[in-house]
Amino acid sequence: MHEGMMWGRIAAGSSWYTFPDDEMTSLRDVAEHAGVSVATAWRVTHGADSVRPETRERVELAMRELLYVPATRPEATGAIGLLLPEFANPVFAALAQAMETYATRSGLATILCNTAGSALREVGYVHMLLERRVERMAFICAEVTDVRSDHAHYQQLIDRGARLVFVNGASEALEATSVGVDERAAGRIATEHLLELGHTRIGFVAGDAFALPTREKTIGRDDALRAAGIEPNGYVAHGPFTVEGGRTAMSALLDEHAADPPTGVICSNDLMAIGVLQEAVARGLRVPDELSVVGFDGIDAGGWTQPPLTTIEQPIDVIAKTAIAALSSELDDPDLALANYVFRPRLRLGGTTAAPPLRKAARRAPGRARAAPR
């Protein structure tokens, strides 16, 4: 190991993958990491047959772990790598489609990479992109959003001069462009909407507790509650960012607070909100008469529920356009290339929110109090 070199690690089961924190990895680094001579490492990188399979495997593993790319490849291509955690999530698909459209208009090809939410798979795709001299990459809701993660592989990309954009997820530890929605404002706007309707027991069906967007929405919700004179309560349940995750979290929330259930719920995304609606139906709760629900994202499927979902809509098209501009030659100014673009979401009213049951009863009370004439 070179003197003064710093190392970062990420875990995968019982394995640790190591990345140097310095500038572009040299062939000597690969040789040392694999425990072979530089000459042997050179033969592997140039496809020579005179290397034992087990030795070749060690060298190739070192190349992947160190993001090493032989310097004999062609120059950088006019393409971008677009890495997202899954294709099934409608908002990821919408972002990818919009970004591909704007990339094409900018003369850039797009290579889509499904990381399946795996840091190691993400690193594998990064290495594949670098091998093909793709030096511009956009990460949608990537591993960087996990506050527990070691972000060393992103830093290494930055050190080697790659142009990165983080979409809907960033890290304060990295000097890179980020483009996304104001998650804290989203949590605040959703909560304020329910407060204005008269709700005070406002739950949060939240995604992964270690995801930065979840933490930001939590802060926004708590800020809105405190501003209304309500101390943030324990009406919070976490689950995966899926329909089933939302339903399971809502079930846990209702079971935990059976004696005093929430009358309104905000959700980390629209998929989770749809799961909340399913759980409400299963329990015989009428939406919005007995339970109000607010989602986040503004996906088309939110308009297909009955009643249509009230949600906090993020500006997908603007986010996509800005992200591609940051990756293209339109933003060669270093100051602009490191900017953070944060866009405010907006409330989109559907039919899943209304005044809480007690407020409705109070409104009807005067009429019921009058005695009918005899």
How would you label these PLM feature ranges?
Residues 135, 200-201, 263:
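Short acidic/polar active-site loop segments enriched in Thr and Asp
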Residues 17-24, 63-97, 106, 116, ...:
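N-terminal helix-turn-helix/winged-helix DNA-binding helices
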Residues 1-77, 357, 362-374:
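N-terminal helix-turn-helix DNA-binding module of bacterial transcription factors
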Residues 109, 135-136, 161-165, 177, ...:
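Proline-centered loop/turn at the N-terminus of a beta-strand
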Residues 123-134, 138, 144-185:
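Short beta-strand-centered segments that line the small-molecule binding cleft or hinge
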Residues 54, 84-94, 112-121, 143-147, ...:
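Hinge/beta->alpha junction and helix N-cap segments in small-molecule ligand-binding domains
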Residues 2, 7, 13, 27, ...:
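Flexible loop/turn connectors
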